[in-house]
Regions:
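Non-catalytic C-terminal interaction segments of nucleic acid-processing enzymes
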Residues: 1-31, 35, 98-99, 116-126
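Acidic-basic catalytic patches of nuclease active cores, encompassing PD-(D/E)XK
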Residues: 18-63
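Amphipathic coiled-coil/heptad-repeat helices and related helical stalk/stem segments
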Residues: 43, 66-68, 93-97
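Secondary-structure boundary motif
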Residues: 53-56, 74, 103
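Active-site beta-strand-loop-beta-strand hairpin of nuclease catalytic cores
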Residues: 66-82
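Catalytic cores of nucleic-acid endonucleases
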Residues: 79-126
Length: 126
């Protein structure tokens, strides 16, 4: 996908500052993790398809310098991180995982938490 110069700069700056490029896993693939619920895996695919259809750049399987791998990274247009919650609640996410992101300067507004068990409405992503 061709990005506008300002969006490309945003992406480049984000990757330079926050992404661990030494970790050699293929980005932009969706790993079928046995530890995730079926609903979680399906919801990730649905969101990725929606982002593709909307021409919004995103990445998956991106290892951050803080060691986290968010479900979906979308540093332009919408929340930077999209996390699909399968068995955990928003409270669980913020109490167990958020501190790693917060230590890198991210805030709660940088996250969109999507419940894997609730039907996704496209407008929820904007």
């Amino acid at each position: 996908m061709k990005l506008s110069p300002s969006d490309q700069k945003t992406v480049n700056d984000f990757f330079r500052e926050h992404v661990d490029r030494s970790y050699k896993t293929p980005m932009n693939c969706i790993r079928m993790n046995v530890d995730h619920t079926s609903a979680h895996r399906v919801r990730i695919f649905e969101i990725c398809n929606l982002l593709i259809d909307s021409k919004i750049p995103f990445w998956t399987e991106v290892r951050m310098k803080n060691g986290c791998i968010p479900d979906i990274l979308a540093p332009t247009h919408i929340s930077r991180f999209i996390e699909v919650l399968g068995t955990e609640t928003p409270g669980d996410f913020f109490s167990k995982k958020f501190h790693k992101y917060e230590s890198c300067g991210f805030s709660e507004k940088d996250f969109l938490l999507v419940d894997a068990k609730v039907e996704l409405q496209a407008q929820e992503l904007w």
